[in-house]
């Protein structure tokens, strides 16, 4: 028997419905903020992620599904969504056109890491990217949008925000951090020692308790911001407060990817483990230029769909009823109900039963399929040109003339 690969799962039945519900909810809200769909390939040149995510990152160093294809091209399955959207933005020459472009995306990402709760080797993300808007109001807007989505799902979260500064204040802070860590570096984990050489600020991203204790009194980037970055961060906090969004300033919050600057944020929840991240993002004004495009400010976020699914499953959310179940009590009426069902499918989701069963058995099947409406034909209904109708939500039932059926529904 052939099974799905480790860390990869099928989306069937209730999982498929939940995935669809999450994506459609996100789409509805992001469209209200002016975002349009951007679909990019699941496979890209490996160099795209080496340049965007950074060769020093764990993603590039350890986790990518990378291979040489039959044409000799170095390719990989995408480990995250932002780089592909940026590549598409540049390839379409939108970076030179000016103006603001807003996109949302969703789909599979791939990382070879240890499978665990809410973390798979093939996982799904929903994300947004805004290009061409440098205002801190846009930073606030993407945070407010994500907060609205998580509220819609009924998930209790804590918003953490930080500023990573810009190309002026970051080098000074990096040197202060290196000086602080230098005498402790031999006590750090192997990953932190590697990061200290390649990208020191990511040492703060370490989740190991031993390293967190050693770095407890490390200098904070928020204490080393220049006037512009400090002013924008204060303005961001003010906008969020005025719009009723609570937050915590976390000076140690650094996004796991190397291209962020200024605003960084993360929504964490205890509903999937102690303060586990369910979504996060920030500003990355340097990435378009870094990937060969015209310098363009950009901000966005990504949300782990599996993590949202895990939380919503715990809430035992009721399945919403949808569609019509149509059936017959005798085989000789199946042709007639098939004809009716086929016609109804032009406007409705319709499940046609090809078997003759008792009314109770049909009702049980309709209930299991979460049908909203139940239509059934027996001898009396057939004689009178009618069909028995029952609404499985409000339990109303009646006989309806077949000629009037669509109008009655």
Curated annotation (Swiss-Prot):
A biological process from GO: histidyl-tRNA aminoacylation
InterPro entries per UniProt: aa-tRNA-synth_II (IPR006195), aa-tRNA-synth_II/BPL/LPL (IPR045864), Anticodon-bd (IPR004154), Anticodon-bd_dom_sf (IPR036621), His-tRNA-ligase (IPR015807), HisRS-like_core (IPR041715), HisRS/HisZ (IPR004516)
PROSITE patterns in the record: AA_TRNA_LIGASE_II (PS50862)
GO CC annotation, single: cytoplasm
Entry's EC annotation: 6.1.1.21
Reaction(s) the record says it catalyses: tRNA(His) + L-histidine + ATP = L-histidyl-tRNA(His) + AMP + diphosphate + H(+)
CDD domains named in the record: HisRS-like_core
Entry's localization field: Cytoplasm
Signal peptide: none
UniProt keyword list: Aminoacyl-tRNA synthetase, ATP-binding, Cytoplasm, Ligase, Nucleotide-binding, Protein biosynthesis
Chain ranges passing through the membrane: none
A GO MF label: ATP binding
HAMAP family from the UniProt entry: His_tRNA_synth (MF_00127)
PANTHER family xref list: HISTIDINE--TRNA LIGASE, MITOCHONDRIAL-RELATED, HISTIDYL-TRNA SYNTHETASE
Name of the molecule in the record: Histidine--tRNA ligase
Biological source species: Campylobacter fetus subsp. fetus (strain 82-40)
Organism ancestry: Bacteria, Pseudomonadati, Campylobacterota, Epsilonproteobacteria, Campylobacterales
């Amino acid at each position: 028997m052939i099974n799905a690969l480790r860390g990869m799962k099928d989306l069937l039945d209730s999982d498929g419905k939940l995935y669809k519900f999450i994506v459609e909810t996100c789409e509805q809200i992001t469209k209200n903020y002016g975002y349009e769909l951007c679909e990019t390939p699941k496979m890209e040149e490996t160099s795209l992620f080496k340049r965007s995510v950074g060769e020093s990152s764990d993603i590039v160093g350890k986790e990518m599904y990378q291979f040489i294809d039959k044409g000799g091209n170095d390719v990989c399955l995408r480990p995250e969504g932002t780089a592909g959207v940026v590549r598409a933005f540049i390839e379409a020459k939108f970076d030179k056109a000016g103006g603001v472009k807003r996109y949302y995306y969703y789909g599979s990402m791939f990382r070879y890491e240890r499978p665990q709760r809410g973390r798979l080797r093939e996982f799904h993300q929903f994300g947004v990217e805004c290009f061409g808007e440098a205002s801190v109001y846009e930073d606030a807007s993407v945070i407010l949008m994500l907060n609205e989505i998580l509220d819609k799902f009924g998930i209790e979260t804590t918003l953490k925000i930080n500023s990573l500064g810009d190309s002026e204040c970051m080098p000074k802070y990096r040197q202060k951090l290196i000086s602080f860590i230098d005498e402790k570096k031999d006590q750090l984990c192997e990953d932190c020692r590697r990061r200290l050489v390649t990208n020191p600020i990511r040492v703060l991203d370490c989740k190991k308790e031993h390293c967190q204790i050693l770095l407890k009194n490390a200098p904070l980037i928020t204490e080393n911001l220049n006037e512009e970055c400090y002013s924008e961060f204060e303005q961001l906090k003010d906008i969020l407060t005025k719009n009723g969004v609570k937050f915590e300033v976390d000076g140690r919050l650094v996004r796991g990817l190397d291209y962020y600057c200024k605003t960084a944020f993360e929504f964490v929840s205890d509903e999937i483990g102690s303060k586990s991240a369910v979504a996060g993002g920030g500003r990355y004004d340097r990435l378009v230029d870094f990937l060969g495009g015209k310098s363009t400010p950009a901000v966005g976020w990504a949300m782990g769909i599996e993590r949202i699914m895990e939380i919503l499953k715990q809430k035992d959310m009721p399945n919403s009823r949808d569609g019509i179940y149509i059936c017959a009590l005798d085989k000789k009426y199946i042709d007639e109900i098939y004809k009716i069902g086929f016609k109804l499918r032009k406007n409705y989701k319709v499940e046609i039963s090809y078997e003759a069963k008792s009314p109770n058995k049909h009702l049980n099947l309709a209930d299991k399929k979460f049908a909203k409406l139940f239509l059934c034909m027996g001898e009396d209904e057939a004689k009178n040109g009618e069909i028995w109708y029952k609404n499985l939500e409000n339990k109303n039932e009646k006989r309806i003339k077949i000629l009037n059926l669509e109008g009655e529904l």
